[in-house]
Every structure is written in structure tokens, then in C-alpha cells.
């Protein structure tokens, strides 16, 4: 029975709860269809628009009423996992009911372990939250945080993007997956968590969702790692007259293309890096980058870019 880990982008879930309720129907149908064919499925998702919406809402409320409590970015991330999980689970259980399948779907609120010494914490560069007119206002609204001027649009909080090291509860996640459950985990890359002398503590940060899910895929011993995104293939010379789609590349070819700056840093590069991380972790590991609505075709080898060792 082949084990598949699927990574959904946060943008695939829309920009508000109403949109999201509709948009989760597609991945739910796709996941259950694969389950029906005998695959084991673990599903992960992004949360960029969702965590931004939650964090901005609390920030706006505090500007209206100073007595409104400040909600840390880490807690906003956990909240986003909760309501995305609710919508995904409801859609999955409805599809399981429709298909008359006895499987269970489970959602793990994910805390991803990172190193407190990660260099990213010395150079936070991921902007989050609302814009403020002045540096003073931004610092007042975001105590103990780094704020920067953002392209002439105002001042904004920035957080680090540390590398994932492990996941709290990974053995329970793996056990549930091996029992045949449809597992949802790794939302938004997980809430960054460090281990201190006194125990675990969450920290503000944004973990790359695809990289975190590639690590989870390794730990649950998946055979296939699929990243679903907005394009049907990975391209070189993207957007240029000599644009060329890639149907299958090996790790050596991928590294050569990366060195030639063929993949955009903020979009395709981290996806290719996540795929390499998974494929290089063992033998007979395959990764695919494909379009959101083409999951079955991608697994059948009809569409998408396959990355092999």
C-alpha cells in the first residue's frame, strides 16, 4: 500500500471562511478517491492568508479598543490550524459518508520543533500583520518584536523563518497514519516551538510549509510526496518566449537548475528544495509538483513535474 503525503497551498483555501468551505471540497474529494483506491493519505496545508486574517483582526481590534488583549503570532497560527482543520475534516467526513467508506479522518494541531540557535532568528525577514504609519506606532503595537519599513507602505512586524527539525507527537502521527486513517497535519508548517531548559515554548515565526511537510513525509516513511500549486508543471525560463516545462528531473539536474537561478526564491524554489529534501532521504522516493485540481492525473504520471533520485 503506497503512502502519499500531499501538500496544499494556503492560497488554495481562499481568503475567508466562506470561500474556504467551498474550496476544501476539491481536496476532500481527491483525497478520498485515492483512499478508495487503496493509498494511504496524509494531507498538509498552508495557512498564509488565514493566519494573516486572524492576526490582523486582533491587531485592528486593539487599535479600536486598547483593552483588547494582544494575541501572539504563534497563537494566531494555531487558531488558523483549528478552523482550517474544522473545514477540512467536515468536507472529508462528508465525502467518506458519500462514498460509504469506514475510514476515520483526524487532524493534528502541529507544533514543529526548531532550534533556538537557528540563524534565522537573528535575521527575521517575513512580514506579518498590519501596516503602521510610524516606527513608534509599530513598535508600540508589537512589543519585543522586530519592525521594518516595508517598501514605502509603512512599518510592519517581521518574524523569522527557521528550519524545521522535528514535530511534537510525530510517533502518534505516524501510528495513526499506519492504521489507515486519513491524517491532516503540518498546517502552515506548524507552530514554531523551541525546547528550553524548563520545557517547550512556542515562538513567533513562519516555517516553510512544504519543507516541514517533506520532513513529516520522511518521518512517516512515505513513498510519494506531492506539492499541489497553481501551475501544471515546473518551468525553466518561466514567462519568457523560450519557456520550457519539466516533466521529470533527477536531483542532480534540479540542483544545476537551482544554481542557475531558474526557480523564483519566493515561489518555486522552496518547493523544489522541499522535494529534494524528501527524494534524497532514501531509495525509491519520488516527489511531484503539480496543479491543485490534477492530483489523480499527477499520480498517474500524466501531468506535473516528477523529481527522482
Curated annotation (Swiss-Prot):
Sorted UniProt keywords: Kinase, Transferase
Gene3D superfamilies, per the entry: Acetylglutamate kinase-like (3.40.1160.10)
Xref: CDD domains: AAK_CK
Record has ATP-binding as a keyword: no
Domain of life: Bacteria
UniProt entry tagged with the keyword Kinase: yes
GO (cellular component) term, any one: cytosol
Residue numbers spanned by region Disordered: 125-144
One Gene Ontology MF term: carbamate kinase activity
InterPro entries assigned: AceGlu_kinase-like_sf (IPR036393), Asp/Glu/Uridylate_kinase (IPR001048), Carb_kinase (IPR003964)
GO biological process: arginine deiminase pathway
Record-stated family: Belongs to the carbamate kinase family.
Name used for this protein in its record: Carbamate kinase-like protein
Native organism: Mycoplasma pneumoniae (strain ATCC 29342 / M129 / Subtype 1)
Amino acid at each position: 500500500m503506497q503512502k502519499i503525503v500531499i501538500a496544499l497551498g494556503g492560497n488554495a483555501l481562499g481568503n475567508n471562511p466562506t470561500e474556504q468551505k467551498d474550496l476544501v471540497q476539491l481536496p476532500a474529494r481527491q483525497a478520498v478517491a485515492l483512499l478508495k483506491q487503496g493509498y494511504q493519505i496524509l494531507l498538509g496545508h498552508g495557512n498564509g492568508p488565514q493566519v494573516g486574517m486572524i492576526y490582523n483582526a486582533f491587531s485592528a481590534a486593539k487599535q479600536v479598543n486598547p483593552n483588547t488583549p494582544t494575541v501572539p503570532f504563534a497563537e494566531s497560527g494555531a487558531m488558523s490550524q483549528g478552523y482550517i482543520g474544522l473545514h477540512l475534516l467536515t468536507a472529508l467526513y462528508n465525502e467518506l459518508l458519500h462514498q460509504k467508506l469506514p475510514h476515520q479522518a483526524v487532524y493534528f494541531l502541529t507544533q514543529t520543533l526548531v532550534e533556538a540557535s537557528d540563524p534565522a532568528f537573528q535575521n527575521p525577514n517575513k512580514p506579518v500583520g498590519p501596516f503602521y504609519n510610524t516606527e513608534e506606532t509599530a513598535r508600540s503595537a508589537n512589543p519585543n518584536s522586530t519592525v521594518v519599513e516595508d517598501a514605502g507602505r509603512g512599518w510592519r512586524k517581521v518574524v523569522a523563518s527557521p528550519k524545521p527539525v522535528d514535530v511534537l507527537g510525530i510517533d502518534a502521527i505516524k501510528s495513526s497514519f499506519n492504521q489507515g486513517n486519513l491524517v491532516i497535519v503540518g498546517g502552515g508548517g506548524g507552530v514554531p516551538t523551541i525546547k528550553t531548559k524548563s520545557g517547550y515554548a512556542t515562538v513567533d515565526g513562519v516555517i516553510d510549509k512544504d519543507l516541514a511537510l517533506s520532513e513529516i513525509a520522511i518521518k512517516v516513511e512515505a513513498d510519494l510526496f506531492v506539492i499541489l500549486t497553481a501551475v501544471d508543471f515546473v518551468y525553466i525560463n518561466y514567462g519568457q518566449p523560450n519557456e520550457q516545462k519539466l516533466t521529470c528531473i533527477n536531483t542532480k539536474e534540479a540542483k544545476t537548475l537551482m544554481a542557475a537561478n531558474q526557480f523564483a526564491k519566493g515561489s518555486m524554489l522552496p518547493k523544489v528544495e522541499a522535494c529534494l529534501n524528501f527524494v534524497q532521504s532514501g531509495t525509491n522516493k519520488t516527489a511531484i509538483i503539480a496543479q491543485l485540481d490534477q492530483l489523480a492525473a499527477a499520480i498517474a504520471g500524466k501531468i506535473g513535474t516528477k523529481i527522482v533520485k
